[in-house]
A protein has these predicted regions:
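Periplasmic c-type cytochrome electron-transfer domains
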Residues: 1-226
C-alpha cells in the first residue's frame, strides 16, 4: 500500500534560486555573554545549522504531506504571522476538532531546554516528531514517514543537498527540523534595543513596567523568562 494518500495534491515547494543564509545568523554579543541566559542557552548547539539543512527543515515544517491525511503541517498551527503560534485558543489537528492547548510560539529555541506547555520534554531532538505522530495533531505513522517522503518528487534532492546523499530516515528528518527551528530568531524587540543601551531609550513608564516585571514580589520573569 502506498504511503501517499491516493488522489492527494502534491505541491512542489517554491524555493529561491539561492538558499537563505541561515548559517550566517548569530545571536547578539550581549545574549551570548549574559550569565543568566547561559543557564538556559546552548542546548543543542552541537547541531550545525547549514543553509541546505535549514532549507530542508523549512520545507518539512510547512509540508502537509507530513500528516496522515495531507491536510495539516507544522506551520498550520505554528503560523509565522503570530510569532509561529496560533491566534485560536485551540488549534485544529487532522480530526477537525480543537486541541486542548494553544499552540506555543517558536523563536529563540536555543534558550528553551524544556518544551511543551507542561515542560515534559527536554530538547528539540526529543520533541519535533511528537506532534507529527500524535493522533490528534498530524496523526502520521513515524515508521511510514520516511517512505512517504521518499515517494515525493522533491525530497530526495533536498536531502542530498543537505546531507550529501538522498537517504531519508527519521534522524535526518529530526535534524533538518531542528536546524530550521533553531534559525527562527527574534533579537530586535524594544526590550533588546533597550538592553543594548542600558535602557536609556526606555520611557519612564517602560522603566516602571520593567521594574515591576523583575521585582522579587511579583516574579513575572520566573515564568516569562524569554
Amino acid at each position: 500500500e502506498s504511503p501517499l494518500v491516493e488522489g492527494a495534491d502534491v505541491h512542489l515547494p517554491n524555493l529561491p534560486s539561492e538558499p537563505y543564509a541561515y548559517s550566517e545568523m548569530v545571536y547578539p554579543y550581549l545574549w551570548l555573554n549574559d550569565p543568566a541566559l547561559q543557564l538556559f542557552g546552548g542546548f543543542g548547539d552541537e547541531i550545525e545549522i547549514t543553509d541546505a539543512g535549514a532549507t530542508l527543515g523549512r520545507v518539512l515544517f510547512h509540508d502537509v504531506q507530513l500528516s496522515a491525511n495531507n491536510t495539516v503541517s507544522c506551520g498550520t498551527c505554528h503560523q509565522q504571522e503570530f510569532a509561529f503560534a496560533d491566534s485560536a485558543p485551540g488549534s485544529m489537528g487532522i480530526s477537525g476538532h480543537a486541541l486542548h492547548r494553544n499552540t506555543p510560539g517558536l523563536f529563540n529555541l536555543r534558550y528553551q531546554r524544556r518544551l511543551f506547555w507542561d515542560l515534559r520534554v527536554v530538547g528539540l531532538a526529543n520533541q519535533v516528531l511528537q506532534p507529527i505522530g500524535h493522533p490528534d495533531e498530524m496523526g502520521m505513522s513515524l515508521d511510514a514517514l520516511p517512505d512517504k517522503l521518499r515517494a515525493l518528487p522533491y525530497y530526495p534532492a533536498l536531502f542530498e543537498q543537505a546531507y550529501g546523499d538522498p537517504f531519508i530516515d527519521l534522524d535526518r528528518i529530526t535534524n533538518a527540523l531542528i536546524q530550521f527551528l533553531r534559525s527562527i530568531r527574534s533579537t530586535s524587540s524594544r526590550y533588546d534595543e533597550g538592553l543594548a543601551n542600558g535602557f536609556a531609550s526606555f520611557t519612564e513608564s517602560e522603566l516602571l513596567g520593567k521594574s515591576v516585571f523583575f521585582r522579587s514580589d511579583t516574579r513575572c520573569n520566573q515564568c516569562h523568562s524569554g
